[in-house]
Amino acid sequence: MTYGNVYVAQIAMGSSDAHTVRALQEAEAFDGPSLIIAFSHCIAHGYELNEGPDHQKAAVNSGYWPLFRYNPAKASKGENPFSLDSKAPTIPIDEYLASEGRFKVVNDQSKATGEAAPAEGSVLANVRHDVNARWNLYEQLSKGWRLA
């Protein structure tokens, strides 16, 4: 997105079919390179694959995987090229991380300290910070703030 001439979208098919289709159609129609970053569940995530769509929704709803589209063609029309297509997080990131076996070390470290809130510098505290910082950046971009 910092180059300003590449279509970029982040999708999660299990979270929103409509968003996925819209992003793929825009990417195909864009006259230039396009990049689609797709959330793809797998057995190594530590849950049954038939639960994949639910986990994708949780990833989006926790802010771990925000849905967005960046379409440079909109900028040439005077429109904001960045669209933040998911709502602000509605579930705690801790809840999402606890639902997946791949994040077991994060959850175990948090439980080992015995503290209600993760200690500063812990993996969980860093994940919370990163999720919040990324969400805030995307929110600013959706309001017209420019990367470059």
Regions found by a protein language model. Give the residues of each.
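Short catalytic-loop micro-motif centered on adjacent basic/acidic residues
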Residues: 7-12
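Glycine/aspartate-rich loop-and-adjacent alpha/beta segment that forms the canonical ThDP
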Residues: 20-140, 145
